[in-house]
Design a protein with these regions (language model features):
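Internal mixed-charge
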Residues: 222-239, 349-427, 431
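Extended, beta-strand-rich, solvent-exposed assembly scaffolds of outer structural proteins
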Residues: 241-343, 347-349
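Alpha-helical scaffold segments that mediate packing/assembly in large oligomeric complexes
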Residues: 101-178, 284-285, 428, 434-438, ...
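Short helix/loop capping segments that flank catalytic or ligand/cofactor-binding pockets
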Residues: 64-67, 106, 196-199, 205-206, ...
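Long, contiguous amphipathic alpha-helices that act as assembly "spine/axial" helices in icosahedral shell
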Residues: 56, 81-148, 177-193, 382-403
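N-terminal "assembly arms/tails" that initiate or stabilize quaternary assembly
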Residues: 1-87, 182, 229, 371, ...
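Surface-exposed, low-hydrophobicity beta-strand/loop segments enriched in small/polar/acidic residues
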Residues: 52-59, 64-65, 80-88, 137-176, ...
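Extended, solvent-exposed, turn-rich assembly/linker loops in the middle of proteins
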Residues: 140-226
Length: 454
């Protein structure tokens, strides 16, 4: 049996230690019904070829119009549509060397210390997996898929009020699911969004009492009757609302032979009567700083910038919606040189963030811990660094968004990578597979998002 820091390692016992470490966020998602445990899928996966991809039937709802029951009108019949949903197992593995563990593992709490770190690591990975899936399904294309994306997205970044307010959440879930909006139970948001709501006194926090009898915040609140999980791993995108403007002022005009480096190119000032072919800039007929600034602006090009002249300044204006640093600009005097320059930021960039808040409802994801053949094991490398003990961990889990199939249209291995999950080409609304596809009603899908500036 393998040893870890001279301790006997029992993988089965260690697994029990890991499993009993509470994952508060996942527990809340389970309690709220967002993650619907489907242990039956594990058996189905074993029955289908490959064991990593499964297609299951999904029954449609009864529909159609009734006829008049008057004793003379024939009763028409219709059948419910049967859709099929495809799901994929996400496999991940990670190993650590003994010294990688930050906690002291030499004492009696060895199992607790290591198991707590391993449990926290995998809880974060599961959260990342969910976010990657959500990113992917909101990147779907095609008419039916885009109807879901558009209706289930509330983007207020260009509205009169760009931050989440008292009515934003309620309006967003109504836009997504109409009169089915009561299905939503949880909103997961960045702390910046939550702080804005706290300042408006719209959040009420849940609390728990620890073993020492101390009451603490769970980091979970409620808003409009929905649970609010605060997590800074939610997506946020940097947006440049004002691009920067930089300048180089020629405070003392250059003489022939002086040099100026702009970007990666060094330019030499030459007499006004000389050729300025190549990396050369004329000093100008009068040799003034203003003439030289104009000549520089006419000569120099730098990707991402528009270069102009204003009096004795060379102005570098960044392209819209970008935030590059100022190009490198320096000057070197020749033997009888005179040039002196001063660089400045005339207009600093204004950068804001677009925050994504996900709103999830009852049964938003089917969830199954499919298990790995060997989830935990130890190995010893006796040679490296005089001997190292290594803990290997593996997991296989299924997170399937309700009403949306993983198509594996762009996947190169049995387990999808993070990029595969984020790729909209790998997702589509559940449908009947016919040539002229009939899709599930998007209002049945309890998944929505709000994009805001806070």
């Amino acid at each position: 049996m393998a040893q870890f820091d001279a301790k006997i390692f029992n993988p089965e016992v260690f697994g029990k230690y890991v499993n009993r470490i509470p994952d508060l966020k996942k527990n809340e998602l389970l309690r709220a019904g967002v993650l619907r445990t489907r242990n039956d899928l594990k058996a189905m996966l074993n029955e289908q070829t490959g064991g990593n991809y499964i297609t299951v039937p999904m029954k449609g709802l009864l529909d159609g119009d009734p006829v008049n029951y008057d004793g003379s009108t024939n009763i028409s019949t219709s059948s419910t549509k049967t859709y099929s949903q495809s799901m994929v197992v996400v496999g991940r593995a990670k190993g650590w060397k003994e010294k990688d563990f930050s906690a002291d593992i030499t004492g009696t709490n060895f199992m607790d210390n290591v198991a707590a770190q391993v449990a926290k690591f995998w809880a974060n990975i599961d959260q990342d997996t969910l976010v990657n899936i959500l990113t992917g399904i909101f990147a779907m294309t095609g008419a039916a898929n885009e109807e879901f994306v558009n209706k289930h997205t509330t983007n207020i970044t260009s509205a009169g009020t760009t931050t989440v307010g008292a009515t934003t959440l309620n309006s967003a879930i109504q836009r997504a699911c109409g009169d089915n909006k009561q299905v939503f139970t949880v909103a997961i948001m960045d702390s910046m969004v939550a702080t804005n709501l706290e300042n408006l006194q719209l959040l009420d926090y849940l609390k728990y009492t620890d073993k020492a009898g101390i009451t603490r915040d769970l980091g979970i609140a409620t808003l409009n009757g929905k649970l609010v999980l605060i997590d800074d791993s939610m997506p946020k995108t940097e947006v440049v609302t004002t691009a920067p403007v930089y300048s180089t002022q020629i405070t003392t005009a250059a003489s022939a032979g002086d040099k100026i480096t702009i970007g990666s190119t060094e330019y030499t000032f030459v007499a006004n009567s000389a050729s300025d072919t190549g990396a050369k800039i004329k000093v100008g007929a009068d040799g003034t700083a203003a003439q030289q600034a104009t000549n520089i602006a006419a000569k120099v090009t730098i990707d991402g910038f528009t270069i102009t002249a204003s009096s004795d300044k060379v102005i570098f204006t960044a392209a819209s919606a970008t935030n590059p640093p100022m190009p490198t600009v320096s000057a070197t005097k020749g033997d009888d040189g005179t040039i002196v320059i001063a660089n400045a930021t005339d207009t600093p960039a204004v950068v804001v963030y677009n925050y994504t808040t996900y709103v999830l409802g009852d049964g938003a994801f089917d969830y199954c811990d499919c298990g790995a053949k060997v989830p935990y094991e130890m190995d010893r490398d006796p040679a490296t660094n005089g001997g190292e003990d290594i803990l290997y961990t593996r997991q296989r889990k299924l997170f399937a968004p309700f009403g949306i199939s993983f198509t594996k249209a762009s996947m190169s291995s049995l387990s999808p990578t993070d990029n595969d999950l984020k790729n909209g080409a790998n997702w589509e609304l559940v449908n009947d597979g016919a040539i002229s596809k009939s899709y599930i009603n998007h209002k049945a899908i309890p998944i929505a998002r709000i994009i805001s500036r806070g």
